[in-house]
């Protein structure tokens, strides 16, 4: 069984009723520290914040490694040296990817950013939630 960190791009679609890809069960999903902060950033009020935070607690939380900033700097540099892709990849996605790599987890997403990361991080597992789901 692989644990999958849920990126906000896929999380929004799952909350709206999308079905996880074959082979990924809802019990396989987790969030990470930066993913939680990214999700809560969208809260519209204190009540909404508290409600969303409670909902997120249903997921296992994978903590960032102690060297996360060094890891993200290296990843950003590797992307910059690979056809200048660094400026197109949001910082939260870099933190999520490095947290996933640390835990040997994958990332379930619905955007292009993780495909770029996979180019410079062989072995990084990313699964895209397709539009039809």
UniProtKB/Swiss-Prot annotation:
It comes from the Bacteria. Keywords: Hydrolase, Magnesium, Metal-binding, Nuclease, Toxin-antitoxin system. Residues 30-118 form the PINc domain. Its cofactor is Mg(2+). Its EC number is 3.1.-.-. InterPro entries: PIN-like_dom_sf (IPR029060), PIN_dom (IPR002716), Type_II_TA_system_RNase (IPR050556), VapC_family (IPR022907). SUPFAM superfamilies: PIN domain-like (SSF88723). The keyword Magnesium applies. It is an enzyme of class 3 (hydrolase). One of its GO terms (molecular function) is RNA nuclease activity. Disulfide bonds: none annotated. Mg(2+) binds at residues 7, 93. Belongs to the PINc/VapC protein family. Toxic component of a type II toxin-antitoxin (TA) system. An RNase. The cognate antitoxin is VapB17. This is Ribonuclease VapC17. It comes from Mycobacterium tuberculosis (strain CDC 1551 / Oshkosh). The gene is vapC17.
């Amino acid at each position: 069984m692989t644990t999958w960190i849920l990126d906000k791009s896929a999380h929004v679609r799952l909350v709206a009723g999308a079905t996880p890809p074959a082979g990924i069960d809802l019990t396989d999903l987790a969030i990470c520290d930066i993913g939680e902060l990214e999700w809560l950033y969208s809260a519209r009020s204190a009540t909404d914040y508290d409600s969303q935070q409670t909902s997120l607690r249903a997921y296992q939380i994978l903590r960032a490694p102690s060297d996360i900033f060094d890891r993200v700097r290296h990843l950003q540099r590797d992307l910059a040296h690979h056809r200048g892709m660094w400026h197109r990849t949001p910082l939260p996605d870099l933190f999520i990817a490095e947290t996933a790599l640390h835990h040997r987890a994958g990332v379930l997403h619905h955007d292009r950013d993780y495909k770029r990361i996979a180019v410079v991080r062989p072995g990084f597992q990313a699964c895209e939630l397709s539009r039809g789901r």
